[in-house]
């Protein structure tokens, strides 16, 4: 695992994010440090599940950025997953925003809830991405950190079965801009905010380097 394996566009994107760490509010930094502490204590076996209501936008962004950021900062063995309180579909606007950031994402199956293959580096394993409940068989059943990235899921799941750690880290839903001239900007902003905070957590997990 090496940052050199990341696609060039992603390396450029990730290199710009630390300049924004100072803009992360201190209460959120404390939450992200709790995540980093969990990751360090797992000694290379950390599993995180990023959760929002529909597993459609923010949770997928969180999953993919956590995976890419772990490689960028040399956090060994981390496995990132996502889920919802219900299954819908990986929203095309979220797919597009992640592609603009530098991920390579390919649709592999047809249907209302297609399976995608996401890649962030030449020699890094592809991640199978589709909308699912957080307790789907594709996700770990216990010992993981549950990261609640929307207030609705946070309220709906005050207790997450099997989670060793539950953190509330809500982001604004870019869905509000669907079908408007601000759509692309809203998704890019959400993507960048989520990337920045997961990068901060991975930098902390790596020892603050």
Regions inferred by a protein language model and the residue ranges of each:
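Short polar/charged helix/loop
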Residues: 2-209
């Amino acid at each position: 695992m090496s940052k050199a394996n990341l696609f060039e566009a992603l390396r450029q994107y990730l290199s710009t994010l630390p300049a924004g760490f100072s803009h992360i509010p201190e209460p959120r930094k404390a939450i992200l440090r709790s995540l980093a502490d969990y990751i360090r204590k797992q000694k290379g076996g950390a599993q995180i599940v990023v959760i929002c209501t529909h597993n459609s936008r923010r949770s997928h962004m969180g999953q993919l950025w956590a995976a890419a950021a772990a490689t960028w900062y040399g956090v060994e063995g981390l496995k990132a997953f996502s889920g919802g309180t219900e299954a819908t579909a990986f929203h095309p606007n979220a797919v597009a925003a992640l592609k603009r950031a530098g991920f390579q994402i390919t649709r592999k199956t047809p249907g209302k809830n297609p399976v995608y293959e996401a890649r962030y580096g030449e020699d890094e394993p592809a991640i199978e991405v589709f909308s699912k409940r957080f307790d789907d068989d594709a996700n770990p059943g216990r010992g993981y950190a549950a990261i609640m990235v929307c207030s609705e899921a946070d309220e709906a799941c005050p207790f997450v079965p099997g989670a060793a750690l539950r953190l509330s880290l809500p982001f604004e839903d870019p869905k509000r801009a669907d079908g408007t001239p601000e759509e692309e900007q809203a998704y890019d902003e959400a993507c960048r905010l989520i990337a920045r905070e997961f990068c901060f957590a991975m930098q902390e997990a790596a020892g603050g380097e």
